[in-house]
A protein has these predicted regions:
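Short amphipathic alpha-helical segments
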Residues: 16-41
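An amphipathic, aromatic/His-enriched active-site/gating alpha helix that lines ligand/cofactor pockets
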Residues: 38, 59-97
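Eukaryote-biased recognition of C-terminal alpha-helical segments
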Residues: 100-106
Length: 109
């Protein structure tokens, strides 16, 4: 199974940057497990001013099913309730999209 790479962008409210970074520096072990169980690896979030850029790799065979399972986890819903309140959608976000998926333009292994 080929690894799929994803890039995403979202805004971060300036007044929540410190809290957001602290939350992720101390990510709950259950959240890490849920992410790994969804076949996600090499997951990073970067910040540039008031924008967050996420990168991750997906190695499963059914992305939609794995993301639905991840989203159904009560602990993930609790995490999102906290972190989503600190974020804002970029204008380019499509309907139903929180983190806006961006295209890959270059890759070297």
């Amino acid at each position: 199974m080929a690894v799929r790479r994803f890039g995403q962008v979202i805004g971060i409210k300036p007044e929540n940057i410190e809290e957001y970074e602290d939350l992720h520096a101390n990510a709950w072990p259950t959240i890490i497990k849920i992410i790994k169980d969804a076949n996600i690896s090499n997951y990073s979030i970067f910040r540039y001013q008031n924008l967050l850029f996420a990168y991750f790799e997906y190695s499963g065979s059914d992305y939609e099913a794995d993301m639905a399972k991840l989203a159904a986890e009560p602990e993930m819903q609790r995490w999102w309730k906290i972190s989503d309140a600190m974020q804002w959608q970029v204008p380019e976000a499509k309907a139903g999209e929180w983190w806006h998926v961006i295209s890959e333009n270059f890759h070297v292994d």
